[in-house]
Amino acid sequence: MAGKMINKMMGFLGLEDDLEEDIEEVEEGKNTKNDFTDVESIMNSKRQNKVVSIHTTISAKVRIVKPTTYEEAADICDELKNRKIIVINTTGLETRIAQRLLDFMGGASYALGGDLEEIEKGVYILSPSSVEVSSDLKNELSAKKIFGWK
């Protein structure tokens, strides 16, 4: 019973070893004794097909923006589409325009799988889906007043 449960879990994770089924099919098709070269080629092809490279060489770039008009929202979202991290300072904008800008960027980040987070009042970070911003970083940036624009 434990063996069946393990096989089901392995199958669910895509790690189930279907080699036994393939070996039986080869044996039935030939009606001969074990042909080890065919079995080895099947085993090697199965193993090679499951190898996937998880290493990527993407470098993160950060852009700091202080928009002056709503029209800059599309350009900022294009940067997000190009997988860049954007820090946006909206302190110089009217409240109504800043809200429209944030709504636009929030929708774009949702559509692209990214994230829009507030660092401090009027300062936001827009990050692509491949970047995770921890709360420690936000607290540190806020405490040090690194983005203390005037």
UniProtKB/Swiss-Prot annotation:
One GO CC term, this protein: cytoplasm
Recorded coiled-coil stretches: none
Keyword Cell division: yes
InterPro entries for the chain: Cell_div_SepF, Cell_div_SepF/SepF-rel, SepF-like_sf
Stated name of the protein: Cell division protein SepF
Listed GO biological process terms: division septum assembly; FtsZ-dependent cytokinesis
Subunit comment: Homodimer. Interacts with FtsZ.
Membrane among keywords: no
Subcellular location per the Swiss-Prot or TrEMBL entry: Cytoplasm
Summary of the function given for this chain in its UniProt record: Cell division protein that is part of the divisome complex and is recruited early to the Z-ring. Probably stimulates Z-ring formation, perhaps through the cross-linking of FtsZ protofilaments. Its function overlaps with FtsA.
Gene this protein is translated from: sepF
Keywords: Cell cycle, Cell division, Cytoplasm, Septation
Family, similarity comment: Belongs to the SepF family.
Source organism: Clostridium kluyveri (strain NBRC 12016)
